[in-house]
Amino acid sequence: MTSAVSDTSLLTRPDLLGPALSRVTRDDRWQQVEAELITGGKSNLTYRLRSPAGELVLRRPPSGAILTTAHDMKREVRVQRALAGTAVPVPAIVLSDDGGLLGVPCYVMTRVDGLVIRDRLPAGIADGPAERVALGNALADCLAELHAIDPASIGLADFGRPAGFVERQVRRWRTQWEASADVPVPAVDELARRLAASIPASSAVAITHGDYRLDNCIVDARDPGRLAAVLDWELSALGDPLTDLGMFLFYWESGPRTAAALVTSVPCLPGFPSGAELAGRWAERTGLPLVDLDWYRAFAHFKFAVITQGIKARVNASAMGGQDFGDLTSAVADTAEAGLALA
């Protein structure tokens, strides 16, 4: 979410959105709302909304969403509302709509000041080893804080079915692969087979983000050791926290080996903590053992390969606002091959 391009589509319907925002905010200046697509999002579409009243952010599914379970607006809204006031910072929900406004579910949230770090570090931000360690530690600590929250204490006791979570996750992503694959990729099929044959016992039950990474967080521009917000909760659930850790480590360590448009390589710059160091920090703060971590890391590779294939399908269907993500076919195969080395 680092740059914006003009929205020339009808995906945001300012003529309908403006009056709705005016009603919920009681500020008629939102009648003059304008929308810009924030590029870099790989699943749901994110728009910056501007008016004389200020700025907000809108989230909606891509046009012609192919895998509806991966674009659940209600899920994002519910978990963000529940986490408000906890140690995990999230934007406040301003408006939630089931489809009457745009023809698809969407929501509007507050715009949080700070930095989304994607392909490079902004000048003067985390340019020394101490700040880089602080940024990495902040990410690990926030993930541990999320996993420490009792779901029932914030109204999320029924947010998912923890029993059998890991097995269902493998099955779910295998099904999504079969639904979106357009060419055979033997490495993906073999990785799915190995994972299904060696599913570990769940380590614990926690609220999981599902796609936790540096560029799904907003970093405080004045203090890189503090996160201002965690974004993009569409894959959140109640399940095994090691699936979150495995995904976080995948993103943290895979930048140079993965399509540059999909994974930031910033954490691989000198001075940032290693994945092993951050995993140890997470384990220390959660009190959970790092059992079968290679399985969870392999699963993260499988999941990302399927996510990448889904992005490719949406790009081919012209459903991603014209964004270019490079050679996604190679990215799918390369990610699966790297996962096989762990499985």
Predicted regions: what they are:
Residues T2-R29:
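Juxta-kinase regulatory segment immediately upstream of eukaryotic protein kinase catalytic domains
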Residues I207-H209, L214:
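Catalytic-loop of the protein kinase fold
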Residues E34-I207, R222-G225:
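ATP-binding pocket architecture of kinase catalytic cores
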Residues G160-R161, L288-A300:
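All-alpha amphipathic helical-bundle segments outside canonical DNA-binding/catalytic cores
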Residues T243-T286, A300-S318:
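Active-site activation/catalytic loop segments of kinase-like enzymes and analogous catalytic loops
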Residues C217-V219:
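Hydrophobic residue at the +6 position relative to the catalytic HRD Asp in the kinase catalytic loop
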Residues L288-D292, V306-A343:
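Helical subdomain adjoining the active site within ATP-dependent kinase catalytic cores
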Residues L231-S236:
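Activation of the activation-loop gatekeeper triad in protein kinase-fold domains
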